[in-house]
Amino acid sequence: MTKPAIRFTIDGRECQAKPGQTIYEAAKDNGIYIPTLCRYEGFKPSGSCRICTVRVGGRYMAACTQPVAEGMAVENKVPDLEDMRKALIEMFFVEGNHMCPTCEKSGNCELQALAYRYQMLVPRFPYQFPKKDVEPAGTKILMEQNRCVKCLRCVRGVRTRDNKSVFGPLRRSRNKKIFVDPELASALTESEARKAMERCPVGSILKKEIGFAVPVGRRKFDKAPIGSEIEKAEE
């Protein structure tokens, strides 16, 4: 027997969800965009980036991990939450060394696309200019630590055929970094190495090959702003 749809609202708009769906998944099915950086389709969500934070009954929660409940009233696109998301995006920029004009991922970078969507100009926080390494992680992958946002998408989604994790977190808090096992990274096929690069939302994981192969104007976010594929689906 099919379970009845769950009825809830997002910013006052009546929505329906399938049982077991998260707020993010249900919002997407209803044509409502909730920004996120750490979520990747097919992987278990971690809620680590907090950009998808929404408010329900005065409580803040990650939309990518919180299941929808009957009668839930979700606040999403409201001024204070949007400003908080913008602040988080700014923090990602100032805590790393993101030189967008010279980055191979420019135009395909989700962090850059979010900065454009939220019209980020000058961050409200001082740049930290941390000293970080560029690591030749084996024969197929380059790890650019200056751009890493610790979203853990690579940790969750890049594994060898015998299910060993190629990437893993080291240390905690502001000293946290993503470690790459060079031996396991070298064992990846060309296709697997390319998928590892694609799963990174920024330009931190790069496959060793010719850079800047896709010209300006044909890159992913040159064509349409991030989130538009969800919002246009409902029009």
Task: Label the model's feature ranges.
Residues 15-70:
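N-terminal cofactor/phosphate-binding cores enriched in small/glycine residues
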Residues 50-51, 59-235:
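Fe-S ferredoxin-like electron-transfer domains
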Residues 11, 19, 46, 172, ...:
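Short glycine-rich loop/turn motifs that provide flexible caps or phosphate-binding loops at active sites
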Residues 12, 38-41, 143, 185:
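A structural connector/turn signal
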Residues 2-11:
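Eukaryote-biased recognition of intrinsically disordered, low-complexity regulatory segments
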